[in-house]
Amino acid sequence: MDLDPNLVINHDDTNLSEISYTMEQDSSSYSLEMGGTPSSAGHRKVDMWQNHNFDSGFQTMNHSEAPSIISSLHPSSHLSGMSSMAEYEPIPNLSEQQKQKFDGITKNPTDGQYNTVRAIPELTMLMKDQDNEVVQKAVMIMQNIAKMECDAMRRQNETKIVDPCVIFTLRNLLRDKVDHPNIIRFTLGTLFNICNRQEGIDLVTRAISEQPDIIPNLIRHIGTFANSIYKYAILTMHSILSDKQRGGQSVTIARQQDAIIHVTPWLEAEKSEKLLPVIVDLIRVLCEKNTDQKVKFVKMGGPQKLLHILQQRGYENLLWRSTQLLKTFSNFDAPCLVAFGGRQILAGMLSHGSPRLVLSTLETLRNISDVPSKMKEELLLKSLLELVNSRNAVIRLYSAQTMSNLVANNRPNKEYMCSNNGVVNLCRALAIATKDWQNFQDKEAQQMEDYAESLICTLRHLCVGHPLAEKVQAYVFREPSIFLHKLMTMRPVLLKHTLNLLLKVVSQNALLAPFLLCRIGEIGFVEQLIHILRVACTQLNVQDVIEGVRVKDIVHLCIQILRLITRNPDILNEVDFFLRSPENSRMGDGHTLPIFVLQKANVEENTKSSTLELIYNLMHHEKMADHLERDEILCKMLHSVQMQAANHPELANLAANILKLMSEKRERNRIHYGRHGSFESQFGHLSVAAQRTEVLNSHGETYEGAGEQWSQPMSDDSMMESYCNSSGRDSSKTYNSPMYHSPPSMYPEYPNGPPSGPYYDPHAFTSTRPTPPHYANYDSPPVYNNIPSNQGPSSHLSDQYPYRQGRF
């Protein structure tokens, strides 16, 4: 390929302000849909260039003939090139002496054009000439060669600029020709075009390893406004630093030279919406995984400048890159972003038509949503309520997680959610997620589990801390089988949040009826709660944490719920039935679950306090009271706790109350037995506690640890088998949850998925399980349909819950 020496670029300073820089989208069709690309002025002399046999591409940017390859080389920048409004004129006549210096460049005898292969060494020498006009022409021709080589349609098979001496010479020009802006501009343009191909990047980075001062000279010109030199310097710097293979050394040098201090001011000063994305991405590269650079950026007001860009600009690519950079600082200095109104500004981005912009915005919002703020956030909450049912799984997940953080410990946000159908939307979303759960596998199932977890957590926050809390609890528990299903999945994180929500719900007497009546198959809440408690107890001495959830927390929540629900006589009967079942009454040395919990030294004091309150409630059941009274270990522990009143007054008081109940019961029995003979004559055939222990020991069985030695049915009931592997706790590992690969079901006779039948059976069961009380007329309490802005059950299909094969 040959060059026409009769053309030169004559840049007019009045047109330099119109130079634009194109940041290509991921796909051309997406750019057309968004319609956000700022218009650029037309080229006035395209027709003239079409009549010449060479087009450098620098001025016309004729993409239809010469598509850029920078997108494939630097996917992070997607920079297609530079355009200019420069005029093209014949080269001004050089003096004869100046022309003679170019006579040494070899020409082809056929067409009289310069031969690029042989011209490069000559041009390299001419760029060292003392005559600045000669240097300018030489570097201009070198720039045209570099532009031709980065053009896939114009370059020859063999790369021509391969000599590091070319880079060193360009470096010298950047250092020595500071007073000649045209030379500097052509030099930077040459470097930029060389960096537009991978071979050129390798050449430049090798030169930098030999002469590191190339980077400082580039940084020096970032602050040069004349002839828009700073634009060329920023583009060239970005091309070098964004190379993923060899850019690391250059990034280190740039950080040492405080490049970020020179680049950051242009976020505010630059007007071009196409150069700003390059500046933002350059800052991202400099700040990536470097705390010092982030601190400098924050001190210079960088986050505020980015938020200002989001408010004032409309170019989608610029907005997306700005949110990507803000996402980095959301994990570094979240309070700073919130203090400058970051949540309110980012909320405006959620209605944008770009999915990647919405997703990036949501991720940033999620990272700063846990920061307390007194600012109004109605717009943000409204947008999140719309996105929580999005078809995009990641968008709805981030929306739910952000919403959960916003309503936690924030009364105004809770009241807004309750008065704007927030509870209704969340319950509907949870019902849909529960219905669709069994249709997903692996990664999709993991996302669905995280989504359900966030919804339950949000509902739990809405159940307390505001005047409408009781009404919300009643509305949330209209379909109790959803939460029973979550308990039956035995997923640690879901268990924790579901148990927390149930702890709020069962505080209402009106909600104990659906709690008792709800069934999936034959499994009810009480049986499942006791099963979870038993499985957790077996792991107290084995492992403290399972997938981020403390086993102690599961034990404490189960005890708390059992303590609250046993105030109901019907539920107390059911609790007694399951606690005295063989698998639950032979924990450790043959004790029931509450006594086993009291024995564990690693259980916290608040858990022991709740356990004593549960035992106190159980003492009001005749059969369970007999069972507890015969346990000598329990009596010894109660006396021991009572004697430690100075250190644990609350526990001592509870122990004293239980011992008082036991004493009163013995007194009643003594009076009763006195009428009909001695206790031994009436019940002499029964074994007392000591005899029972001797019988157990006579079989040679030992009861140590957490009951894991029981052959039936405890031997196969380890935590890791019963608690399925929860989702997303270690993103570095492949998600392979046993829940989604058909593990042995906890209850083989019942399906794992949501049932198709009604959620409770008004008729008596034929099994040996306790029969729930029959309610002749069971209606929802009036508060169910009294949520603000909820006009009660709607007859319109779109306002009802999704259709199911019957209720759970």
UniProtKB/Swiss-Prot annotation:
Biased composition (Low complexity): 737-750
Annotated region described as Involved in transcriptional activation, given as residue ranges: 1-85, 541-808
Compartments, record wording: Cytoplasm; Nucleus; Membrane; Cell junction
A single GO cellular-component term on record: adherens junction
Region ranges (Disordered): 702-808
Subunit and partners: Interacts with apr-1, axl-1, daf-16, lin-23, and pop-1 (via acidic region in N-terminus 1-44). Interacts (via ARM repeats) with pry-1.
Official protein name in the record: Beta-catenin/armadillo-related protein 1
Source organism of this protein record: Caenorhabditis briggsae
Name of the encoding gene: bar-1
